[in-house]
Design a protein with these regions (language model features):
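Acidic, Ala/Val/Gly-enriched low-complexity intrinsically disordered segments
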Residues: 3-5
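Glycine-rich flexible loops
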Residues: 8-262
């Protein structure tokens, strides 16, 4: 073998080993996020699933039938863009909800991670058929805008991906009717933070309703918050960027239904 060939071989081996190290670190991060959503009561028993995009053809995901609070890196599976197994240790299979994750990645190339959980308050709103559309807190308006409810679908079938699909180009968080919540973003941490934000928003809305109903922000206040978001240059989809009424200079609010959230 020539010196040039040796150099190419060593370079290839370096990148291969580096990729393996990076994958292991990502697996550890997935386990950490799984522990967080479990400890915060966002999932029970074996509920929920998490995935991370490595590249256009490789994805890491949590296994089915395993508590997300007690995972270790060897639990994590690798699948292709069709959800087919590339690598999984004995006894582990990819989440049964992998179809939903793959639909998000297919229709949102900017997304690098997806988190699905069953947070108590957000899921309660999903069960009651009430979308999170009331502008009650600046942080929620800026970070989420509003959170629609995707129609009910049978878990592990194409029904949920089909139901979620219509909202993917407009929102970074969706409630799943009678099921839970789905968030996605440009990193695992950001996808998790969106799930936290959805649950916090839902909890505040629930509690304020118990106290006689929330005092909503005015349309002018919401418009100013939308402008702040634009100035921040925050990534992802948001009603501030796609609201049809807002584009026409008309009243833009969290339940005007021009974006399908109402």
């Amino acid at each position: 073998m020539t010196e040039a060939e040796n150099k190419i071989k060593n370079t290839y081996q370096y990148f291969k080993e580096t990729d393996m190290v990076n994958e292991f670190e990502i697996k550890k991060q997935i386990c950490d996020i799984g522990k967080r959503i479990y400890n915060q009561g966002m999932v029970a028993a074996n509920d929920g699933n998490i995935s991370v995009k490595l590249n256009d053809h490789e994805f890491l995901c949590t296994p089915t039938g395993v508590s997300k609070g007690f995972m270790t890196p060897e639990f994590i599976c690798k699948v292709d863009e069709n959800g087919k197994v590339i690598q999984a240790n004995e006894g582990f299979k990819p989440s049964s909800e992998i179809k939903m994750h793959m639909r998000v990645y297919k229709e949102r190339p900017d997304v690098k991670s997806v988190v699905h959980a069953h947070p108590i308050y957000a899921t309660s709103f999903a069960i009651a058929g009430i979308p999170l559309t009331q502008p009650i807190m600046p942080e929620a308006v800026i970070a989420l805008g509003c959170v629609p409810i995707a129609e009910y679908g049978t878990p592990s079938t194409e029904e949920i991906p089909d139901a979620v699909s219509k909202y993917l180009q407009y929102f970074d968080a969706v409630l799943l009717a009678n099921h839970g919540a789905l968030t996605y973003s440009d990193s695992l941490l950001n996808a998790y933070h969106k799930m936290e934000s959805v649950e916090f928003y839902a909890k505040l809305l629930f509690n304020s309703r118990l106290l006689g109903g929330p005092k909503e922000l005015s349309k002018e206040q919401v418009a100013r918050l939308y402008e702040i978001r634009r100035q921040f240059g925050l990534k992802g989809k948001h009603p501030a960027n796609i609201c049809l009424n807002n584009k026409k200079g008309e009243f833009s609010c969290h339940n005007c239904e021009s974006c399908g959230a109402g």
